[in-house]
C-alpha cells in the first residue's frame, strides 16, 4: 500500500453529483431510459478511508460504515456498492489471491438514495482508493471505465469527479461547458423517492438533447441557459413527494437564489447563487427541522471568487 504519510491509511472524498438539467430523450428496447444531462460536483462529500485489515476478517476488503447517514446502510453492507466495486476490481485485476487484507471505512455524510449519486460516488472513490493501494497493478483506463459502467450508469462520471455531459443511460461522457465559480445550496427533505417509481410516474414523452455553449462567462449566462432546460423527472417526483415542491419554493425564495431545481430523480434539490458565500449566507432562510442543508461551491473551484 502506497502511503506517503506513513500512517498506513489512504483517503478519498466522494462528492455529490448534481444534475443541473436532465432530459429523458428516449427509451431502449430493454426498458432503460436514455438521458441527456449536465452533471457537476458539489463540495459536499462522503469520505472513505482505506487502512490495513485483519487476517481473519473473512474477505480481502471489508467495509465499516459510519457518519450521519450511515445507520440505514449498516444492516446490508454486503450489497453496498463499495464492496461490489472492491470485489469486481479484484477480479478484473486478477490479484485476488495476492492481496493483503484491507478495510474501508465509509463516513456517510450525504443523504442516501437522494438523487445526488452518493452510492455511485462512493463506489468510484473505492476504485480510486484501491488503485492507489495497488500501484504495481496496472489497469487501462478503458477497462476501468467498463468496470464502472457494470457497477452503475452514474459511476463512470464519478471516477474523475469533473463536470461532464452525460448521455446514453448516463455512461456516455462528453466535456462540459467551462463553468463560472457559482455558489450552490443542496436541500434534502428526508423523504425517500424510489427512482423506478419516478420513471413510471413521468409523462410518456421525450425531450430533445440540449444545445450548450463551450463556456459560460458568468453565472447569469449559465442560469439563463439552464432556465430554458428542465429536469424531466421533477414533476413526477413532486407528485409522489409533495414536500419536494415545498423545498423548491423555499429555495426559490432564498436571498440571492438564481435557479432552483431537483437533482436526478430526487428528492435532493439545489439552488444556484452568484458565489459560494452567497449560498452560505442564505442557509438560515432555508433551514427547516428535519431537512439536510448544505451550502458552498462546486468541487474543484475556488471557495470564493
Curated annotation (Swiss-Prot):
User: Is the keyword ATP-binding in the record?
Assistant: yes
The UniProt entry annotates the active site at 17, 154
Q: Which reaction does it catalyse?
A: 4-CDP-2-C-methyl-D-erythritol + ATP = 4-CDP-2-C-methyl-D-erythritol 2-phosphate + ADP + H(+)
> Where on this chain does ATP bind?
111-121
**Which GO terms fall under molecular function for this chain's record?**
4-(cytidine 5'-diphospho)-2-C-methyl-D-erythritol kinase activity; ATP binding
The question of whether Oxidoreductase is a record keyword is answered with no
InterPro entries documented for this protein: GHMP_kinase_C_dom, GHMP_kinase_C_sf, GHMP_kinase_N_dom, IspE, Ribosomal_Su5_D2-typ_SF, Ribsml_uS5_D2-typ_fold_subgr
Pathway connected to this protein: Isoprenoid biosynthesis; isopentenyl diphosphate biosynthesis via DXP pathway; isopentenyl diphosphate from 1-deoxy-D-xylulose 5-phosphate: step 3/6
Q: What EC number is given for this enzyme?
A: 2.7.1.148
Gene Ontology biological process terms, A to Z: isopentenyl diphosphate biosynthetic process, methylerythritol 4-phosphate pathway; terpenoid biosynthetic process
Q: Which UniProt keywords apply?
A: ATP-binding, Isoprene biosynthesis, Kinase, Nucleotide-binding, Transferase
**Record-annotated membrane-spanning stretches:** none
Q: What class of enzyme is it?
A: transferase
On the tree of life, the source organism's domain of life is Bacteria
Tell me its family.
Answer: Belongs to the GHMP kinase family. IspE subfamily.
Function statement: Catalyzes the phosphorylation of the position 2 hydroxy group of 4-diphosphocytidyl-2C-methyl-D-erythritol.
Q: What is this protein called?
A: 4-diphosphocytidyl-2-C-methyl-D-erythritol kinase
Q: Which organism is it from?
A: Gluconacetobacter diazotrophicus (strain ATCC 49037 / DSM 5601 / CCUG 37298 / CIP 103539 / LMG 7603 / PAl5)
Q: What's the encoding gene here?
A: ispE
Amino acid at each position: 500500500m502506497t502511503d506517503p504519510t506513513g500512517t498506513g491509511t489512504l483517503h478519498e472524498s466522494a462528492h455529490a453529483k448534481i444534475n443541473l438539467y436532465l432530459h429523458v430523450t428516449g427509451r431502449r428496447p430493454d426498458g432503460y431510459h436514455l438521458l441527456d444531462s449536465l452533471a457537476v460536483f458539489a463540495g459536499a462529500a462522503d469520505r472513505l478511508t482505506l487502512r490495513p485489515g485483519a487476517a481473519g476478517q473473512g474477505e480481502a476488503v471489508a467495509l465499516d460504515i459510519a457518519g450521519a447517514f450511515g445507520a440505514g446502510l449498516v444492516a446490508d453492507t454486503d450489497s453496498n456498492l463499495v464492496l461490489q466495486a472492491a470485489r469486481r476490481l479484484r477480479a478484473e485485476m486478477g490479484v485476488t489471491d495476492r492481496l493483503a487484507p484491507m478495510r474501508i471505512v465509509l463516513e456517510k455524510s450525504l443523504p442516501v438514495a437522494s438523487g445526488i449519486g452518493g452510492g455511485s460516488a462512493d463506489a468510484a472513490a473505492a476504485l480510486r482508493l484501491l488503485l492507489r493501494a495497488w500501484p504495481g497493478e496496472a489497469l487501462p483506463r478503458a477497462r476501468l471505465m467498463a468496470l464502472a459502467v457494470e457497477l452503475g450508469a452514474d459511476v463512470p462520471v464519478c471516477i474523475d469527479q469533473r463536470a461532464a455531459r452525460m448521455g446514453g443511460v448516463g455512461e456516455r461522457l462528453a466535456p462540459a461547458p467551462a463553468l463560472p465559480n457559482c455558489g450552490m445550496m443542496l436541500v434534502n427533505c428526508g423523504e425517500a423517492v424510489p427512482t423506478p417509481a419516478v420513471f413510471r410516474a413521468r409523462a410518456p414523452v421525450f425531450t430533445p438533447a440540449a444545445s450548450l455553449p463551450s463556456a459560460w462567462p458568468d453565472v447569469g449566462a449559465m442560469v439563463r441557459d439552464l432556465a430554458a432546460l428542465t429536469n424531466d423527472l421533477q414533476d413526477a417526483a413532486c407528485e409522489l413527494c409533495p414536500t419536494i415542491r415545498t423545498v423548491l419554493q423555499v429555495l426559490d425564495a432564498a436571498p440571492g437564489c438564481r435557479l432552483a431545481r431537483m437533482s436526478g430523480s430526487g428528492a435532493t434539490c439545489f439552488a444556484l447563487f452568484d458565489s459560494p458565500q452567497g449560498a452560505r449566507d442564505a442557509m438560515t432562510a432555508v433551514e427547516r427541522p428535519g431537512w439536510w442543508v448544505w451550502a458552498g461551491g462546486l468541487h474543484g473551484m475556488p471557495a470564493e471568487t
